[in-house]
């Protein structure tokens, strides 16, 4: 057993590198892409459309990649292909592209990067669930590396862009995706067995289960509430007069509390059933968006709102991955992760990005956060429904 545990740890180290490099890429790309597009001369509506391309690819790419990975067992080889193609696309950002050309490059790049976390999470969930139960402690340690990567680049990029301007954004993109590609090629070439009797397993019967259906409704509205942060937060702070350094620092606060949560979550998670955590996380999101809408110009209040990210993202993410691993085991795991990406990030990303752009253009960026507060309240109600449906079953299933 000690040898098996040591082998599992060795296998998880490359996954930690993938998590660190991928979220290092996200740490500068997502916060500063809108500001780069703004410097290129695009208006709010055009920026919202271009930033929504990433979410649009999550409507089809994750499930396609998930289907391939489930039916071939070759998650690692597919990850390597996706990372390499994304790096090639990033090199094209150096050229002077019009809105259509830029949109096309982003479409191809995001089609390949959008597959990376679902497949990586599925492969990692397989490793940390081999004892029969989801190991939140080991998962948290690996995911913590991603948060550290995000933290480093959001700090460095903010200072860099403040001093040198946004013209170096394509260079940062290429360097970060080169790191992702290198780390993906370091992954052990583990192929999951594909038993012929399991190939025809369908996700349909799982989706018809009431707790699963309400779980996805919760995930949809919870992440829809986050779009105000993912797409418009940097623009909102910029409009309020915050410098790029302070924008980076405010992003960093959310990542620091995220790191603390991932490092200590094994201590806190057993205190409540997983579905009860869903309720807590969405309720915290309702509070966070309301505070951001009303008091974003008060620094210390905004800092406290950002600190709620420990619950609204970190805790929520771990709970969702654990529930997915429970409801979509074995050969269903890749498609379960992909469905989560499509429903929780694809549709909300497209709707939130496009509607948020229209709202902010008409009523100002603050309006996005008031609407986000309302969608978070809907997520809270849906999470409560999940808890009511599943709570009696959780202790027996090892999910309490």
Stretches found by the model and what they are:
Residues 2-9, 187-219:
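Juxtamembrane intracellular "pre-TM" segments in multi-pass secondary transporters
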Residues 5-55, 212-250:
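Helix-loop boundary and gating motifs at the non-cytosolic
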Residues 20, 89, 99-117, 220, ...:
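Hydrophobic core of transmembrane alpha-helices in multi-pass small-molecule transporters
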Residues 77-91, 276-291:
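Structural signature of the two symmetry-related core transmembrane helices
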Residues 107-145:
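Cytoplasmic helix-loop-helix junction between adjacent transmembrane helices
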Residues 159-175, 358-376:
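A membrane-interface helix-boundary motif in multi-pass transporters
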